[in-house]
Amino acid sequence: MLRAGAPTAGSFRTEEVHTGTTIMAVEFDGGVVVGSDSRVSAGAAVVNRVFDKLSPLHQRIFCALSGSAADAQAIADMAAYQLELHGLELEEPPLVLAAANVVKNISYKYREDLLAHLIVAGWDQREGGQVYGTMGGMLIRQPFTIGGSGSSYIYGYVDAAYKPGMTPEECRRFTTNAITLAMNRDGSSGGVIYLVTITAAGVDHRVILGDELPKFYGE
């Protein structure tokens, strides 16, 4: 006989793993910079401090993941598979817009089942560097965009600090500063900063460690 108050089968609950996060992408003339923090949490617990939330979809196309870790990665994996087939059929790399449409269609089709927001960014020969937001099956191109739980803390900063015509290094600094500010305020963002710069020449990966992050007032 079960004792009163004793746990029964099915009574144990586990918290869903989330990339409660800050993600960002910025266009510049000739490419894009994509960045994210690295913290993954389940409830109040941090389950991974150095998770790379920048997932490749094709050679020069990446997506930044936020929301449920499993859901976001599932969308990225499905999109990467479809784009690989697409590239083989066309015998040329897929366009960034095509990749964004694939992510948008998957996100919309499974909107009742999946909890995820992906930013798609990359470079192609037709349009150069491009950044697309895909929230809830929406698709919009923007010169820069932010997402994740930490983004609510930095809208004012990015609106004030962004300026057209920035160099790749200025875009990396802009992205690093914005994500650092979000990490300082958002309990679900933290760890290191991953940066990917995508141009016609290829993909450059960088990691900004905790002791290399910029310092701001109050730290």
Swiss-Prot record:
Record's keyword annotation contains Nucleus: yes
Gene3D superfamilies per UniProt: Glutamine Phosphoribosylpyrophosphate, subunit 1, domain 1
InterPro entries: Ntn_hydrolases_N, Pept_T1A_subB, Proteasome_bsu_CS, Proteasome_sua/b, Proteasome_suB-type
Site residues (Cleavage), renumbered to this chain: G20, T21
PROSITE patterns recorded: PROTEASOME_BETA_1, PROTEASOME_BETA_2
Molecular-function annotations in GO: threonine-type endopeptidase activity
One example of a Gene Ontology biological process annotation: immune system process
GO CC annotations, alphabetized: cytosol; nucleoplasm; proteasome core complex; proteasome core complex, beta-subunit complex; spermatoproteasome complex
Keyword Protease applies: yes
Induction and repression of expression: Up-regulated by interferon gamma (at protein level).
Post-translational modification: Autocleaved. The resulting N-terminal Thr residue of the mature subunit is responsible for the nucleophile proteolytic activity.
Propeptide regions on this chain: 1-20
A Pfam family that the UniProt record links to this protein: Proteasome
Modified positions (N6-acetyllysine) in chain numbering: K53, K109
Reactions that this protein is recorded to catalyse: Cleavage of peptide bonds with very broad specificity
Highest taxon above the source species: Eukaryota
Subcellular location: Cytoplasm; Nucleus
Record-stated family: Belongs to the peptidase T1B family.
The protein's assembly and partners: The 26S proteasome consists of a 20S proteasome core and two 19S regulatory subunits. The 20S proteasome core is composed of 28 subunits that are arranged in four stacked rings, resulting in a barrel-shaped structure. The two end rings are each formed by seven alpha subunits, and the two central rings are each formed by seven beta subunits. The catalytic chamber with the active sites is on the inside of the barrel. Component of the immunoproteasome, where it displaces the equivalent housekeeping subunit PSMB6.
Additional information: Encoded in the MHC class II region.
Record function comment: The proteasome is a multicatalytic proteinase complex which is characterized by its ability to cleave peptides with Arg, Phe, Tyr, Leu, and Glu adjacent to the leaving group at neutral or slightly basic pH. The proteasome has an ATP-dependent proteolytic activity. This subunit is involved in antigen processing to generate class I binding peptides.
Protein name: Proteasome subunit beta type-9
Annotated source species: Mus terricolor
